Amino acid sequence: MTMTDPVADMLTRLRNANSAHHDTVSMPHSKLKVHIAEILTTEGYISGWEVADARVGQTLTLSLKFGPNRERSIAGIKRVSKPGLRVYAKSTELPKVLGGLGVAILSTSSGLLTDRQAEKKGVGGEVLAYVW
């Protein structure tokens, strides 16, 4: 069975593993998911990621990040643009997550960018997710 929304599946797996205090979470690999993992690592929400060969295809494994007393580094994660309702933002109307404390992940003509990177480059695009 094919997956309708692989990004939503990734975010849901990440949210569930985070709330269950798992150290890692695995999912099917795709280039888009790797780019999202790179953004989450750069922004400090996860500690790292790796791609491994599985019996069928490749698997992306994310290493979750916790504080000294096992506090979650990801307080919340939300899928914004969905297959049934796409959400786009102009470069002048980029969303701010929690007044700039969180990050919005956008798919732009320059690749996947955070809201801050898109603002610097002056590009808009599809708002994939909010992470805070």
Swiss-Prot record:
| Alphabetically ordered keywords of this record | Ribonucleoprotein, Ribosomal protein, RNA-binding, rRNA-binding
- Does the keyword section mention Disulfide bond? no
Keyword Zinc-finger appears in the UniProt entry: no
Q: Name one GO biological process term.
A: translation
SUPFAM superfamilies, A to Z: Ribosomal protein S8
An annotated GO cellular component: ribosome
Q: Which domain of life does the protein's organism represent?
A: Bacteria
Signal peptide positions (record): none
In Pfam terms, one family for this protein is Ribosomal_S8
Alphabetically, the GO molecular function entries are: rRNA binding; structural constituent of ribosome
Give the matching InterPro entries. Ribosomal_uS8, Ribosomal_uS8_sf
Listed under subunit, the entry gives:
Part of the 30S ribosomal subunit. Contacts proteins S5 and S12.
Q: Which family does it belong to?
A: Belongs to the universal ribosomal protein uS8 family.
Per the entry, what this protein does is: One of the primary rRNA binding proteins, it binds directly to 16S rRNA central domain where it helps coordinate assembly of the platform of the 30S subunit.
Protein name in the entry: Small ribosomal subunit protein uS8
Query: What species is this protein from?
Result: Leifsonia xyli subsp. xyli (strain CTCB07)
Query: Which gene specifies this protein's sequence?
Result: rpsH
